[in-house]
């Protein structure tokens, strides 16, 4: 398995926007990147009248939709517990990097996206696994030593940090 980095922060902080920049920058260089995105909502991936939704409604445990352009697998959990992050990671095809949006308290290295204007506290003071913070405010006094502080408004600098982190970090 390649490297895994969580991208965490409160709703509205800009996690997905930053991830778009990071994935695009890495993919443009030919790097294979996977993404796992967690949602607390009941996600509807296709309209109920479409074939794959109808088959899931009929009782199929999993439905795989395949075309010359992409493959999608939808598994209905029904009464099963939500799989943990390790299980989800094991189901992905190999990649140099898997970025994980959400799973705030998972035991993986993380980049926090922190935007104080949304009115939520930073997570990094309570999570030693946060290795960097991308924010639109300067590094506060008292931020722990070794914590990278990145400019959220400069995605290229966050990408440069990610390149260095990938060279230095140990693959799990």
Task: Identify the residue ranges that each predicted region occupies.
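N-terminal phosphate/diphosphate-binding loop that engages ATP/GTP or pyrophosphate donors
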Residues: 21-83
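Short, hydrophobic beta-strand segments that form beta-sheet elements in well-ordered domains
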Residues: 98-100, 110-115, 129-137
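Conserved C-terminal guanine-recognition region of P-loop GTPase G domains, centered on the G4
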Residues: 105, 109-126
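The conserved Walker
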Residues: 11
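Conserved NTP phosphate-binding and transfer environment spanning the P-loop NTPase/kinase superfamily
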Residues: 129-172
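Conserved lysine of the Walker
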Residues: 15
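Hydrophobic anchor at the beta1->P-loop junction of P-loop NTPases
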Residues: 7
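Phosphate-binding/switch loop-helix module in NTP-utilizing enzymes
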Residues: 76-105
């Amino acid at each position: 398995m390649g490297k895994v980095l969580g991208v965490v922060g409160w709703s509205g902080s800009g996690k997905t926007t930053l991830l778009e920049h990071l994935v695009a920058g890495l993919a443009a260089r030919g790097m294979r990147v996977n993404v796992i995105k967690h949602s607390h909502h009941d996600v509807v991936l296709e309209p109920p009248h479409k074939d794959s939704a109808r088959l899931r409604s009929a009782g199929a445990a999993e439905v795989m939709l395949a075309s010359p352009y992409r493959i999608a697998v939808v598994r209905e959990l029904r009464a099963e517990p939500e799989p943990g992050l390790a299980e989800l990671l094991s189901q992905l095809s190999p990649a140099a990097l898997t970025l994980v949006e959400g799973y705030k308290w998972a035991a993986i290295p993380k980049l926090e996206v922190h935007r104080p204007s949304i009115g939520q506290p930073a997570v990094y003071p309570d999570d030693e696994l946060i290795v960097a913070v991308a924010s639109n405010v300067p590094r506060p006094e008292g931020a722990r030593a070794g914590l990278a502080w990145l400019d959220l408004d400069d995605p290229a600098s966050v990408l440069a940090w990610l390149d260095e982190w990938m060279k230095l970090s140990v693959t799990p």
